[in-house]
């Protein structure tokens, strides 16, 4: 797959194109230019490190939405075995913006649930761009309650711009579905591990992100509203999105300092989409450790800690 570069990555893109050209020349001729290729590759890596070491919140928001970033089904394929997808909310329909089912994690049976976006136009429409309707959240809750019944840990992956705001979704009780998930998740009598892998958009993300451990990938975001939405409300123009991103504190490091996130999972150089394999290794290592810890904590303490965490959301500082 040809890499897609964001606007602030254009200097990296130019070097990458030059490297590709030199590799083509070397393959098509007897000239050995490997030293020059290695020199440019090192220069590209150094440039990438430099750019990504000082990303602004707005730029991190762009990385979190990168079209080649791994989605929930990619994590399921890499981290789990024997995945059996479960469908439907038993009330209205099956929402393809939420995927989930039974699987094995290191041989242990678990329930995995997450948002799913699409790669191409057809799939994006089918998945509603990762924006669940009420039936998606009700499906997620049905799966998590099933996990509780059989004593299975729950692992969730969060990646959504937000809950779908359409008229039909509101008529079918979007806010009720989200609110019920928040209520039930605080009482779910099994370990719950949550990982934000891309966009963590408002209540649409929180509805499957109330857990004993909440993780964020290094270049993911988590916020009550998108920077563009915030800018449109406060400044009446989306052009102020960069200012909004700065004010909202959407980044993983910032949220960890506020004790809203347990672990910031390091991403490969250039972001998770540049090296799926390393990303999966990093995520798996964290989930293995947290699952072991969660299963050693008495259930009463686990539930108390989970409740205290969600009740701490919404605090603010006047500084």
From Swiss-Prot:
EC main group: transferase
A GO term, aspect molecular function: ATP binding
Any Gene Ontology CC annotation: acetyl-CoA carboxylase complex
Record's subcellular location: Cytoplasm
Record EC number: 2.1.3.15
Entry keyword annotation includes Lipid metabolism: yes
Matching Pfam families: ACCA (PF03255)
Keywords of this entry: ATP-binding, Cytoplasm, Fatty acid biosynthesis, Fatty acid metabolism, Lipid biosynthesis, Lipid metabolism, Nucleotide-binding, Transferase
Domain of life the protein comes from: Bacteria
InterPro entries: Acetyl_CoA_COase_a_su (IPR001095), ClpP/crotonase-like_dom_sf (IPR029045), COA_CT_C (IPR011763)
UniProt keyword Ion transport present: no
Alphabetical GO biological process terms: fatty acid biosynthetic process; malonyl-CoA biosynthetic process
Pathway named in the protein's UniProt entry: Lipid metabolism; malonyl-CoA biosynthesis; malonyl-CoA from acetyl-CoA: step 1/1
Record field: catalytic activity: N(6)-carboxybiotinyl-L-lysyl-[protein] + acetyl-CoA = N(6)-biotinyl-L-lysyl-[protein] + malonyl-CoA
Transmembrane spans: none
Classification via Gene3D superfamilies: 2-enoyl-CoA Hydratase, Chain A, domain 1
Domain annotation CoA carboxyltransferase C-terminal: ranges: 39-293
NCBIfam families: accA, AccA_sub, PRK05724.1
Role, per record: Component of the acetyl coenzyme A carboxylase (ACC) complex. First, biotin carboxylase catalyzes the carboxylation of biotin on its carrier protein (BCCP) and then the CO(2) group is transferred by the carboxyltransferase to acetyl-CoA to form malonyl-CoA.
HAMAP family registered for this protein in UniProt: AcetylCoA_CT_alpha
Subunit structure: Acetyl-CoA carboxylase is a heterohexamer composed of biotin carboxyl carrier protein (AccB), biotin carboxylase (AccC) and two subunits each of ACCase subunit alpha (AccA) and ACCase subunit beta (AccD).
Entry similarity comment: Belongs to the AccA family.
Protein's name in the database: Acetyl-coenzyme A carboxylase carboxyl transferase subunit alpha
Species assigned in the record: Neisseria meningitidis serogroup C / serotype 2a (strain ATCC 700532 / DSM 15464 / FAM18)
């Amino acid at each position: 797959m040809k890499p897609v570069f964001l606007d602030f990555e254009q200097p990296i893109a130019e070097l990458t194109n030059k490297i590709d050209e030199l590799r083509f020349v070397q393959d098509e001729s007897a000239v050995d230019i490997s030293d020059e290729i290695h020199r440019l590759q090192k220069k590209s890596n150094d440039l990438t490190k430099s750019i990504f070491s000082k990303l602004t919140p707005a730029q991190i928001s762009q990385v979190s939405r990168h079209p080649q970033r791994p989605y929930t089904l990619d994590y399921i394929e890499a981290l789990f075995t024997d995945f059996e997808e479960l469908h439907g909310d038993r009330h209205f329909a099956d929402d393809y913006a939420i995927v989930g089912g039974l699987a094995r994690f290191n041989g242990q049976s678990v329930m995995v649930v997450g948002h799913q976006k699409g790669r191409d136009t057809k799939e994006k429409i089918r998945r509603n761009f990762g924006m669940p309707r009420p039936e998606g959240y009700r499906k997620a809750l049905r799966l998590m309650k099933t996990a509780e019944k059989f004593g299975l840990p729950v692992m969730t992956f969060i990646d959504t711009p937000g809950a779908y705001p359409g008229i039909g979704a509101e008529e079918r009780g979007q806010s009720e579905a989200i609110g019920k998930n928040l209520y039930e998740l605080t009482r779910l009598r099994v370990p719950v591990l949550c990982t934000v892998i891309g966009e963590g958009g408002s209540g649409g993300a929180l509805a499957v992100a109330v857990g004993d451990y909440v993780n964020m990938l290094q270049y993911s975001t988590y916020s009550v509203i998108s920077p563009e939405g915030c800018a449109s409300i406060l400044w009446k123009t989306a052009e102020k999105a960069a200012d909004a991103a700065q004010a909202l504190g959407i980044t993983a490091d910032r949220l960890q300092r506020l004790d809203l996130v347990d672990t910031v999972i390091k991403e490969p150089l250039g972001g998770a989409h540049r090296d799926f394999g390393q990303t999966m290794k990093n995520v798996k290592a964290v989930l293995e450790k947290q699952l072991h810890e969660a299963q050693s904590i008495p259930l009463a303490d686990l539930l108390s800690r989970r409740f205290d965490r969600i009740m701490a959301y919404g605090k603010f500082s006047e500084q």
